[in-house]
């Protein structure tokens, strides 16, 4: 069995099983929102509930909380969290697995388990305390194949009153080191709580392009508070030599049932949509768009020196890896929306040309190998490369994978759930 729900896992292999011949278990019809508690700001949902579904449920009832949507609003709230996805509002809510609290799982042997406080009959705090008693097992089901998750709780964000942002700009790489150090300081103090965006750096190293670097820092909260937080952030960034800082107008957030302000990016206001997919659509500027892309997403230390080293490493190796051809690979784009680390995203286009796609596949494998040699590894992987990337987590003769296999054999003795997902195979298929 290979469980899926409403999401499509775009850029990471789609909804296809890892193991050929698997039976796809579609959970879309398990689509109930079981509870939304406004006073303690949490939801309990089934796997067929999409971000659109949960948003509409909240709006229709006038509940004054936000969800944290990723780019694909059609995606499953549970599925996105289990695959390690994230969103675009405030931390910690945009770390979707990190913001979950309690789950119900059907194991491979048919046993039904509730994690955390949910293991207590008639539990009153299942969605309010994630740890419960004894070893915490929820992580076994993130990118896992130990069972089928049938319910999951999530902490929601009380609607903040207002939103404001500032943008710090530097003109050289030395300034980027200061940007990262200052961002770390501000986020670790929870002064900047929104999903930041880094651009620039030259060589396609961000959405902004150009030789300099820019960093947008959004903040959510009460107007007087966030105005003071932004002023403090500005004072810190302006200590970087040559740094300029501009501020946006404050935006008051819409109450349930109100229209969002014009021109805003909806996902930054807890509103799911699909606008990001327009970049893949046909237009006068892009008459023959690619058929999609696959993402290479290594995790990097949140330091300016490492950001620059990754960019230079990519540029130094790009021609050799692509065989001297322009394969349309885009990157690196540096994502700063995970606290305490960076993602050095590289996007590989998928086309209707089999020969081109074969070159893309070869280039992807080579980038994985080169990155692993530098100590950089991915946090998420397209289906076809999950074994390859699992092998880069090889400390002590692959001890982590061996431990996962032992647990897999214990809770799914017949190996029937999602064989091979994220490099974990059941006993009867390990050497197949």
Please give the residue ranges for each predicted region.
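Conserved glycine-rich FAD pyrophosphate-binding loop
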Residues: 1-7, 11-28, 243-432
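Flexible loop/turn segments at secondary-structure boundaries
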Residues: 9-13, 51-53, 74-76, 122, ...
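Residues forming anionic-ligand binding surfaces in small-molecule and nucleic-acid pockets
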Residues: 31-38, 150-162, 210, 282-297
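Glycine-rich, charged/polar anion/phosphate-binding loops
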Residues: 87-92, 123-124, 132-141, 151-153, ...
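C-terminal cap/substrate-recognition region of VAO/PCMH-type FAD-linked oxidoreductases
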Residues: 137, 153-154, 164-175, 179-274
């Amino acid at each position: 069995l290979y469980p899926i729900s409403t999401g499509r896992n775009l850029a990471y292999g789609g909804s296809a099983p890892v193991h050929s011949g698997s039976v796809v278990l579609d959970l879309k019809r398990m689509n109930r929102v079981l509870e939304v508690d406004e006073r303690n700001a949490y939801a309990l949902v089934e796997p067929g509930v999409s971000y659109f579904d949960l948003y509409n449920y909240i709006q229709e009832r006038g509940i004054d909380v936000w969800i944290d949507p990723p780019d694909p609003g059609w995606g499953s709230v549970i599925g996105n969290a289990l695959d390690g996805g994230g969103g675009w509002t405030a931390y910690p809510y945009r770390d979707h697995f990190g913001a979950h609290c309690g789950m119900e799982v059907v194991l491979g042997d048919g046993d039904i388990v509730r994690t955390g406080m949910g293991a207590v009959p008639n539990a009153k705090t299942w969605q309010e305390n994630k740890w419960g008693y004894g070893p915490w097992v929820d992580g076994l089901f993130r990118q896992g194949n130990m069972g089928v998750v049938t319910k999951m709780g999530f902490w929601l964000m009380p609607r903040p009153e207002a939103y404001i942002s500032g943008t710090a700009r530097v003109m050289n790489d030395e300034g980027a080191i200061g940007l990262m150090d200052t961002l770390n300081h501000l986020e670790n103090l929870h002064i900047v709580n929104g999903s930041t965006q880094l651009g620039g750096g030259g060589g396609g190293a961000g959405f902004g392009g150009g030789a300099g670097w820019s960093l947008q820092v959004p903040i959510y909260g009460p107007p007087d508070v966030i105005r003071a937080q932004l002023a403090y952030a500005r004072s810190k960034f302006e200590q970087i030599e040559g740094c300029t800082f501009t501020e946006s107008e404050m935006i008051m957030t819409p109450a349930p049932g109100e229209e969002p302000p014009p021109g805003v990016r909806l996902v930054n206001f807890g509103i799911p949509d699909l606008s990001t997919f327009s970049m893949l659509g046909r237009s006068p500027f892009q008459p023959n768009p690619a058929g999609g892309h696959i993402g290479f997403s290594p995790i990097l230390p949140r330091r300016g020196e490492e950001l620059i080293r990754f960019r230079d490493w990519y540029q130094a190796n790009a021609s050799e890896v692509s065989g001297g051809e322009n394969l349309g690979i885009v990157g690196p784009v540096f994502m700063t929306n995970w606290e305490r680390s960076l993602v050095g995203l590289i996007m590989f286009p998928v086309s209707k040309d089999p020969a081109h796609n074969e070159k893309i596949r070869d280039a992807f494998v080579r980038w994985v190998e080169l990155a692993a040699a530098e100590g950089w590894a991915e946090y998420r992987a397209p289906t076809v490369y999950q074994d390859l990337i699992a092998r880069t987590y090889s400390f002590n003769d692959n001890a982590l994978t061996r431990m996962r296999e032992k647990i897999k054999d214990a809770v799914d003795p017949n190996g029937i759930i999602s064989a091979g997902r994220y490099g974990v195979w059941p006993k009867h298929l390990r050497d197949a």
